[in-house]
Amino acid sequence: HDALPIFLYLPGGYPEFYLSELAAAERSRSSIAAYAAAGGRVLAECGGMMYLCRAIRDEEGKAYPMCGVLDQEATMEGMRLRLGYRKLRLGGREYRGHEFHYSSIVPQEVSEETVGEQLTARDEVAPTLLYRRGNVLAGYTHLYFAEQDPFALFS
């Protein structure tokens, strides 16, 4: 049996365009859920976070099962553009990035621990959260790693 990788990075994308295909990929979904449950380190940004949710709902409200690592749903219902530069303060470090999405998380506050502080470019509190469940970190912000080591997020 292959050893677990040291890190799984699920960047953004547009999972809402591939809901049927992602839902049908049961083996991939269960492998990712098992990896996370075994303590694997996962960083999921935007579409990657949506994929880790219990389900993604399309614009009409139809739910498609996803990985179920996070106990929440992403929804495209009532789409609204959210964007801007972000600063994430976590573990004594500051990370920079940006947020660009039309989906939302429901409910926003769930059983996962929310960590860090996210600010706008004007140092105002950003309305989105960074979720942590074990070694899984997931949020809407696409991080810029030229200034900080992504592995430091897990220390």
Task: Pin down the residues of each PLM region.
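Short, small-residue-biased leader/transition segments that mark boundaries at the very start
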Residues: 2-4
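Helical hairpin unit composed of two closely spaced alpha helices linked by a short loop
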Residues: 6-10, 51
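Short, solvent-exposed amphipathic alpha-helical segments in soluble enzyme
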Residues: 8, 24, 154-155
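Structural motif
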Residues: 9-11, 43, 138-140
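Cysteine-nucleophile active-site neighborhood
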Residues: 15-87
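Amide-donor transfer/coupling interface in amidating biosynthetic enzymes
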Residues: 74-155
